[in-house]
Structure formats: structure tokens, C-alpha cells
């Protein structure tokens, strides 16, 4: 409940930041343009982001006879939700993610490395975690937050280019060039931090929800420890090529030697494991 409230506050803050930036740059018209732009991007992301991300990772659909599909199907029926489509990514780095605009149009993807490295119980824990993301509609929340953050960065970049070519605003509703330059630097950073905080909050909720669906928090805790270790041992090439998708995965797939928690899309594995173990 606390994490859900936190997510709402963070999304509201992200939207407010977008409106403020639009207002500073273009007054009331700027506010409307910023919201309209974000709305168009969110509409596109809502309908097409799942297809796009699956293509990015060359994910192939698994047959209904595959044991992973059977696990997902059993977990979905246990949770009383639709059975997502299941995909396999041919990559030796163990990881997984969920995508889709709602439970009826959701997909779960796992890597070959995850199936090779984890036990069936640990795989079940991971799949339950991803199913919890689907049930909580975290895939939609993440798309919205990423889109708004991206819009803020885009507006900041646009202001930078306009300033470079001498097109800064001089009207009453315009913003002073110095203030604009400061905002250009600070706003994308603030938006990114808020987006990352939303992602971290949703991971905790999915951990708890997944543990309840599988019936054993230890399965996910054990899987997270193995996945975290693997993340230190090898690179996930496709994820490094598409860093904007890092927040989708159960473990941060990027190998940048552990930035401070403030700048991470995921909570620390140690804290996640501790919370899971405290459930029993």
C-alpha cells in the first residue's frame, strides 16, 4: 500500500515537472503543448511498446508444451488472471522481464541463461515475480513514467538547440536564458531520478506479490542472488545496446559497476532478499 501511494506521488511529481517546464518555456501554451506531446507518446507506447521491446531482444514465442509455459499457466490460474504469452531470448545471461499494456495482452520473456542456471523452483519464483508485475499493471506504469521522463529530456534538448541558434523567448511568458539553461540541465536529471524511484518501488511490490503467488518467498530470494552474481560475471549485450529497457528486467542487466542506489532502476539485491526472507 505504501509503495502504491509512493508510485502515485512520484507519477504526479513527474507530470507536474513536465507541466512546469512547459509553462516556463511557453506559458500556458507551452503547458498544453507539453501535455499533448506526452499524450501522443504515451498513446504510441501503450499500443506498440511490447512488440518493440520483444523485437529488440529477438524474442521467440514458446510453445504451449514448453515447461516454462506450463509454470506460467499454473501460476496465472492460481492468481486468477489471464495467461500471458511466453517468449525465449537466446542469451546466456540469466534474466527475465514482463511487458504488455494489460493482463489480457501481456508477455513474459526469459533468457536461455536463466533456464540453464536456475532450478525449477527458482524459475517459478522469477515467473511469479513477472506475473505480479503484469497483475499490478507495472508494465503500463513504467511505460508512462519513461515516456514522460523522455518528453522532459526532449523539451530540454529542444530548448538547448533553440538557445544555441538564438531563438530564446523574449516575451512576457518566456523564461530568462540563464534560468532556461539551468533548467535544461536539472530537469532531465530530476525526471530520471523520479522514474528510477518509481521503478524501484514497483520491484518491491512485484517481489512480495510474486512470493505470495508462488507460495515460497525463498525461491525468488535464491534466484535473485544467482542472477545478481551472474550480472557481475558477464555482459548482456542487447541490454547494453538498449539501456532504456533496463528497468523492465528482474535484475538490472547493465554492467556499470554499481552506481549509487539513487541512480539505479532497481533496489539493491541484498535489500530485496532481506524483505523476502522476512515474509516467513
Swiss-Prot record:
<keyword id="KW-0997">Cell inner membrane</keyword>
<feature type="binding site">
    <location>
        <position position="133"/>
    </location>
    <ligand>
        <name>Zn(2+)</name>
    </ligand>
</feature>
<feature type="binding site">
    <location>
        <position position="129"/>
    </location>
    <ligand>
        <name>Zn(2+)</name>
    </ligand>
</feature>
<feature type="transmembrane region" description="Helical">
    <location>
        <begin position="146"/>
        <end position="166"/>
    </location>
</feature>
<keyword id="KW-1133">Transmembrane helix</keyword>
<keyword id="KW-0472">Membrane</keyword>
<protein>
    <recommendedName>
        <fullName>Protease HtpX</fullName>
        <ecNumber>3.4.24.-</ecNumber>
    </recommendedName>
</protein>
<dbReference type="GO" id="GO:0004222">
    <property type="term" value="F:metalloendopeptidase activity"/>
</dbReference>
<dbReference type="GO" id="GO:0005886">
    <property type="term" value="C:plasma membrane"/>
</dbReference>
<dbReference type="GO" id="GO:0006508">
    <property type="term" value="P:proteolysis"/>
</dbReference>
<feature type="transmembrane region" description="Helical">
    <location>
        <begin position="30"/>
        <end position="49"/>
    </location>
</feature>
<keyword id="KW-0378">Hydrolase</keyword>
<dbReference type="InterPro" id="IPR022919">
    <property type="entry name" value="Pept_M48_protease_HtpX"/>
</dbReference>
<keyword id="KW-0862">Zinc</keyword>
<dbReference type="Pfam" id="PF01435">
    <property type="entry name" value="Peptidase_M48"/>
</dbReference>
<keyword id="KW-0812">Transmembrane</keyword>
<dbReference type="InterPro" id="IPR001915">
    <property type="entry name" value="Peptidase_M48"/>
</dbReference>
<feature type="transmembrane region" description="Helical">
    <location>
        <begin position="7"/>
        <end position="26"/>
    </location>
</feature>
<feature type="transmembrane region" description="Helical">
    <location>
        <begin position="178"/>
        <end position="198"/>
    </location>
</feature>
<dbReference type="GO" id="GO:0008270">
    <property type="term" value="F:zinc ion binding"/>
</dbReference>
<dbReference type="InterPro" id="IPR050083">
    <property type="entry name" value="HtpX_protease"/>
</dbReference>
<keyword id="KW-0482">Metalloprotease</keyword>
<keyword id="KW-0479">Metal-binding</keyword>
<feature type="active site">
    <location>
        <position position="130"/>
    </location>
</feature>
<keyword id="KW-0645">Protease</keyword>
<keyword id="KW-1003">Cell membrane</keyword>
<comment type="similarity">
    <text>Belongs to the peptidase M48B family.</text>
</comment>
<feature type="binding site">
    <location>
        <position position="203"/>
    </location>
    <ligand>
        <name>Zn(2+)</name>
    </ligand>
</feature>
Amino acid at each position: 500500500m505504501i509503495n502504491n501511494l509512493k508510485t502515485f506521488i512520484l507519477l504526479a511529481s513527474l507530470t507536474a515537472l513536465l507541466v512546469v517546464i512547459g509553462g516556463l518555456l511557453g506559458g500556458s501554451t507551452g503547458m498544453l503543448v507539453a501535455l499533448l506531446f506526452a499524450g501522443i507518446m504515451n498513446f504510441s507506447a501503450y499500443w506498440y511498446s511490447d512488440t518493440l521491446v520483444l523485437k529488440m531482444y529477438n524474442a521467440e514465442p514458446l510453445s504451449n508444451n514448453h515447461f516454462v509455459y506450463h509454470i506460467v499457466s499454473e501460476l496465472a490460474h492460481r492468481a486468477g488472471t489471464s495467461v500471458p504469452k511466453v517468449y525465449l531470448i537466446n542469451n546466456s545471461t540469466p534474466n527475465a522481464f514482463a511487458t504488455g499494456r494489460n493482463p489480457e495482452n501481456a508477455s513474459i520473456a526469459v533468457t536461455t541463461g536463466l533456464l540453464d542456471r536456475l532450478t525449477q523452483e527458482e524459475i517459478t519464483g522469477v515467473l511469479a515475480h513477472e506475473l505480479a508485475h503484469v497483475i499490478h499493471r507495472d508494465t503500463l506504469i513504467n511505460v508512462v513514467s519513461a515516456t514522460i521522463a523522455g518528453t522532459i529530456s526532449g523539451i530540454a534538448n529542444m530548448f538547448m538547440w533553440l538557445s544555441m541558434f538564438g531563438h530564446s523567448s523574449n516575451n512576457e511568458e518566456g523564461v530568462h536564458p540563464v534560468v532556461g539553461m539551468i533548467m535544461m540541465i536539472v530537469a532531465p536529471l530530476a525526471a530520471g531520478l523520479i522514474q528510477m524511484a518509481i521503478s524501484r518501488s514497483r520491484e518491491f511490490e512485484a517481489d512480495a506479490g510474486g512470493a505470495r503467488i508462488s507460495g515460497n518467498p525463498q525461491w525468488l530470494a535464491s534466484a535473485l542472488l544467482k542472477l545478481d552474481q551472474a550480472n557481475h560475471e558477464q555482459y548482456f549485450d542487447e541490454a547494453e545496446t538498449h539501456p532504456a529497457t533496463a528497468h523492465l528486467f528482474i535484475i538490472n542487466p547493465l554492467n556499470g559497476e554499481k552506481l549509487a542506489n539513487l541512480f539505479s532502476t532497481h533496489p539493491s539485491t541484498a535489500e530485496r532478499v532481506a524483505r523476502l526472507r522476512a515474509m516467513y
